[in-house]
């Protein structure tokens, strides 16, 4: 039985139509050819890092109710990390705040991963681990558990969105 059966029961009807393997393959080719969002790592020296949902203050307040000790290392997963916006922002916030923790980037696109890695390197960040894989493979990768998971704009692209949510929940730390 899934850890969060109610969540899965609520979303499963919305994802009853699954994409075909051919559609999934075309989508993978698209993101390999056109990594999203378009970013140039040479711009990192002048690029602002703003946004949501991976803003450290928002995570502290909205996810942990401002009750999580800041001295406790934060393990975060950015699933479907694309060209690295969420990864760069959260890793930079942790580093600037002198907070312990690490960010795990996961995306199936080698092209997007290459851009994300170059952006992280351009900023001199050392608190990011990169993995090229589908988030559907998370339970087999042995990467968790994570205190926080960011998966924005990804599930609807999967051949099995409910399975994707189940995979994310499987690596989320208790509590």
What are these regions (language model features)?
Residues 139-149:
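A short acidic, Gly/Pro-enriched loop at the edge of an enzyme's catalytic core
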Residues 162-174:
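A short glycine-rich, Lys/Arg-flanked "PGG" loop and its adjoining helix->strand segment in the class I
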Residues 75-138:
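Class I SAM-dependent methyltransferase SAM/SAH-binding core
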Residues 1-51:
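N-terminal, positively charged/glycine-rich alpha-helical extensions of SAM-dependent methyltransferases
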Residues 33, 38-74, 89, 93:
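Conserved alpha-helix/loop element of class I SAM-dependent methyltransferases that forms part
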Residues 147-160:
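A short SAM/SAH-binding and catalytic strip from SAM-dependent methyltransferases
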């Amino acid at each position: 039985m899934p850890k969060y059966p109610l969540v899965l029961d609520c979303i499963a009807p919305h994802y009853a139509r699954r994409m075909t393997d051919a559609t999934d393959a075309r989508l993978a080719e698209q993101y390999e050819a056109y990594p999203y969002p378009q970013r140039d790592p040479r711009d990192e020296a002048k690029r602002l890092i703003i946004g949501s949902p991976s803003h450290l203050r928002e995570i502290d307040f909205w996810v942990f109710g401002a009750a999580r000790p800041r001295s406790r290392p934060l393990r975060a997963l950015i699933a479907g990390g694309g060209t690295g916006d969420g990864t760069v922002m959260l890793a930079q916030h942790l580093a600037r705040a002198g907070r312990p923790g690490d960010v795990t980037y996961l995306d199936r696109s080698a092209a997007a991963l290459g851009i994300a890695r170059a952006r992280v390197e351009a900023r001199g960040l050392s608190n990011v681990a990169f993995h090229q894989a589908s988030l559907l493979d998370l339970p087999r990768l042995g990467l968790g558990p994570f205190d926080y998971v960011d998966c924005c704009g990804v599930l609807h692209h999967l051949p099995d969105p409910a399975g994707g949510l189940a995979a994310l929940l499987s690596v989320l730390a208790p509590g």
